[in-house]
Amino acid sequence: KDENYFLYVGNMEKRKGVDILIKAYRRYREEGGTRPLILAGKMQEDDIEQLLETALTEVEGLTYLGYVSHTTRYDLYNNCSCFVFPSMAEGFGMPILEVMKHNKPILASNLKIFDEVVGDCVERFSLAGDDDDKVISLVNGMKNIDKKINSGLVDENAYRHALDKYTPERLGGMVRDFINSQMNNR
């Protein structure tokens, strides 16, 4: 199901790129974009909270839900048009895998870890340059998603392949093998 909105779920902090996303969404709307943006997650930083409070009063189509339950998060993933993940620093990127289970388009930053996790099966935007450059790159990504949204943007086979690499059993085996290798290197 597609209820026609961009979605971000995660901690509300700069390292997750939330400031870039809020600024990019403002610009996206100023440039004629119409798709709403829903933000969900625990507020972590005062400056993000202030930026968001201002944007909520000035930018049409922006909604902040705060922290949401697992059930609500599942529904949000299931009903979004596109998941936006603008992270500046990420250990793994579990939300991307969660969204892939719903076969939804994803627009993510071009962090190296995402190359390893999902390869090239998601849309990417550049983190190069200063904040203005990042905002422009993300706005362009959002506009490209708007153009492609109904044209089979998701490669379900590529998603399935990415998800198969990270089953709980496989991840558990990787952790076990790592711990064993560390124990053997003593």
Where in the sequence are the language-model features?
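Conserved donor-binding/catalytic core segment of Leloir-type glycosyltransferases
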Residues: 1-16, 22-25
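Glycosyltransferase donor-sugar binding loop
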Residues: 9, 34-50, 66-67
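Nucleotide-activated donor-binding/catalytic signature segment of Leloir-type glycosyltransferases, i.e.
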Residues: 49-74
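Short alpha-helical donor nucleotide-sugar binding micro-motif in glycosyltransferases
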Residues: 75-80
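Aromatic "clamp/platform" in nucleotide-sugar-dependent glycosyltransferases that forms part
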Residues: 88
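Short hydrophobic beta-strand element within catalytic cores of glycosyltransferases
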Residues: 105-108, 112
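A charged, aromatic-enriched C-terminal amphipathic alpha-helix characteristic of glycosyltransferases
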Residues: 149-182
